[in-house]
């Protein structure tokens, strides 16, 4: 008597998004089906292996053979030393300790880029532009704790995420005000990267610069407080800082779009923009994005999307694992 093969025989798969504070784990139980998401504080576990075992025990998962972890680190070989947590481990030794057939690691923003390929339209908010060109490159940029930058190019095997450190490219001031802000930062830091401004700490730096320029004592405000005061019209200085932040993001995003030829769209990830969607639609971002002289019409056609999905790192890890297993 013959039996029908189970096309999901290698499920469930373990996927994770590991940061310095929390590790988010989930099970992919079928293609693009993510279940049992759990957040574990990293400080409560001595090793990544301990955290994984705790999650598997908590979720009741059995028969897990394949796993992928997105992690806030460059992946340069077998040894991983987290820069913002004490966990350090060998990928191969961890695979063996967990009894897995497959364990792959990828940079967390590379995972976020891959997640774009699986994001549904309901989790995207378009800000200007027209329709994306099918199979054209896509640009992915994410201001948050830092500034993640990636791109997606299509190949016969599917979408490939470009792993780079574009957030650390030199920042290009656009006007006299941005030159003043750049000069203030240059006096504090040896290299003024795009990330110096396009991050939570960057918003605080812009605000600080404006306050000093006006010979005012800058209040000790968290980035979230600057944003809140700006959106509630409680502080003209905070509003100016947020306007400049969005304009700077427009410059950097359009530079990336031109570099990649990203007629497939520009995708904004990270934790900052989704907190101010109504404002962002009418912020200086889009006008600055298109302000490129002879290439204004080229950029005007490129759609920009704010990514709203809740766990893009986990979705991207699942996409990376699926791509890997197709090719082994």
From Swiss-Prot:
Q: Which GO terms describe its biological process?
A: glycolytic process
Q: Where in the cell is it found?
A: Cytoplasm
Chief subcellular location equals: cytoplasm
List the catalytic activities from the record. Answer: D-glucose + ATP = D-glucose 6-phosphate + ADP + H(+)
Q: Which molecular-function annotations from GO does this UniProt entry contain?
A: ATP binding; D-glucose binding; glucokinase activity
Spans through the membrane: none
CDD domains, per this entry?
A: ASKHA_NBD_GLK
Provide the Gene Ontology terms for cellular component: cytosol
Q: Which InterPro entries match?
A: ATPase_NBD, Bacterial_glucokinase, Glucokinase
This entry's Enzyme Commission designation comes to 2.7.1.2
Ligand binding (ATP): 16-21
Q: What class of enzyme is it?
A: transferase
Which UniProt keyword terms apply here?
Answer: ATP-binding, Cytoplasm, Glycolysis, Kinase, Nucleotide-binding, Transferase
Q: Which domain of life is it from?
A: Bacteria
PANTHER family (alphabetical) = GLUCOKINASE
Task: Describe the family membership recorded for this protein in Swiss-Prot or TrEMBL.
Answer: Belongs to the bacterial glucokinase family.
This protein is called: Glucokinase
Q: Supply the source organism for this entry.
A: Neisseria gonorrhoeae (strain ATCC 700825 / FA 1090)
């Amino acid at each position: 008597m013959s039996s029908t093969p189970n096309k999901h025989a290698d499920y469930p798969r373990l996927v994770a998004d590991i940061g310095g504070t929390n590790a988010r784990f989930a099970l992919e139980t079928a293609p693009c089906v993510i279940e049992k998401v759990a957040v574990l504080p990293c400080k409560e576990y001595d090793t990544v292996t301990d955290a994984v075992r705790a999650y598997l025990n908590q979720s009741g998962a059995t028969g897990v053979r394949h796993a992928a972890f997105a992690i806030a680190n460059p992946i340069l070989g077998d040894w991983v030393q987290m820069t913002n947590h004490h966990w350090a481990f060998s990928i191969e030794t961890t695979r063996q300790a967990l009894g897995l057939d497959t364990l792959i690691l990828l940079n967390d923003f590379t995972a976020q880029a891959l997640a774009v390929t699986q994001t549904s339209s309901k989790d995207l908010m378009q800000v200007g532009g027209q329709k994306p060109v099918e199979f054209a490159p896509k640009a992915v940029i994410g201001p948050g704790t830092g500034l993640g930058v990636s791109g997606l190019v299509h190949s016969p095997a599917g979408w490939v995420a470009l792993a780079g450190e574009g957030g650390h490219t030199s920042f290009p001031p656009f006007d006299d005000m941005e030159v003043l802000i750049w000069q203030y930062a240059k006096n504090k830091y040896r290299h003024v990267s795009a990330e110096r401004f396009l991050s939570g700490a960057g918003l605080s730096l812009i605000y600080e610069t404006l306050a000093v320029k006006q010979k005012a004592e800058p209040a000790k405000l968290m980035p979230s407080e600057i944003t809140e005061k700006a959106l509630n019209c409680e502080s003209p200085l905070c509003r100016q800082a947020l306007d400049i932040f969005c304009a700077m993001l427009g410059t950097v995003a359009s530079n990336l779009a031109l570099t990649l030829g990203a007629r497939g769209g520009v995708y904004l990830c990270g934790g900052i923009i989704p907190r101010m969607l109504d404002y962002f639609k009418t912020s200086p971002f889009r006008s600055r994005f298109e302000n490129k002289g002879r290439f204004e019409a080229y950029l005007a056609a490129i759609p920009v999307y704010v990514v709203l999905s809740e766990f893009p790192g986990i979705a991207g890890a699942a996409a990376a694992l699926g791509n890997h297993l197709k090719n082994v």
